[in-house]
Amino acid sequence: AVARACNMTPSAVSKLISRLEKRLGVRLLNRSTRQFQLTSEGCQFYEQGIQILNGLDELEQSVTANHIPKGRIRIHTSFSYWTHFLLPCISLFNQRYQEIELEAHLSDEVINLVEQRIDVAIRTGPLKSSNLVARSLGSTYKQYVCSPLYIEKYGCPEHPDELHEHQLLDVSYQRQNKTWLFKKATQEVSLTPSKVLKVNHGEAILQLALAGAGIAQLNEFQIRNALQQKQLVKILEDWNIHASEEFHAVWIGHDKYVPNRVRTFLDFLVEHASIN
């Protein structure tokens, strides 16, 4: 992929990297017959190099005559955020910033921004990586829901312990079953589901819930219309834990040295694609 992007042969790229490693006196890549993986020194070199290049890009943009942001932005986001927030305003962005080319990669998994060469990623929950800069896009609440059809067939649980007898829906990219949390006044219940149908993104879980396939834990913005149209109903409302889930746009580098095209995209997200 690197060779194609640079219009070079793989062997030529490999030789350049080997020369760089020799000059630095450290190994930047771990090599195998099928893939390359960055070492910790390689990650550090890449991340600091990105900061330097971003600073040069910002300098170049600041001295050009028109200051028009341009170039490609590789973004990574979940299907849910793309569907409910980015997709409705992407045409406006393309119309407003015609010199910027967006390349979107959609999945609900947390990926390595360095390895996947991602400029901006949308992430939910606590931020674990200290080398990422973040900008808040707001927060939402999760609700436990199912369809009236499901209740008609299997009944409605009135206590979290009864969920062991029900079909639950959850994401599949976690190795272990996620703990579901419930709170009622001073009582707290944690449940690790045993009977779970798993799929790999939140919008598929929504569709399964609408089809009566089980009980799901979904973001409020995903189910708003379905609740209004009575396609879904909330369950265990007295037990729902009202903890918010934060959304952030994250990138590698320093907040001071962000390429003009990336800063433009971040500003657009805050204005048009924040969680309300």
Regions found by a protein language model. Give the residues of each.
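Helix-turn-helix DNA-binding motif, specifically the short coil turn and the N-cap/start of the second
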Residues: 7-12, 16
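Central regulatory/effector-binding core of bacterial HTH transcription factors
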Residues: 70-133
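Alpha-helical linker/hinge and terminal dimerization helices associated
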Residues: 23-24, 45-67
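Conserved amphipathic alpha-helical core elements
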Residues: 20-21, 232
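Acidic, Gly/Pro-rich loop/turn segments at junctions of secondary structure
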Residues: 105-199
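A late-sequence structural motif
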Residues: 237-276
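A short LG(V/I)-centered, amphipathic sequence patch enriched
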Residues: 21-38
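Hydrophobic hinge/microswitch elements
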Residues: 190-236, 242, 251
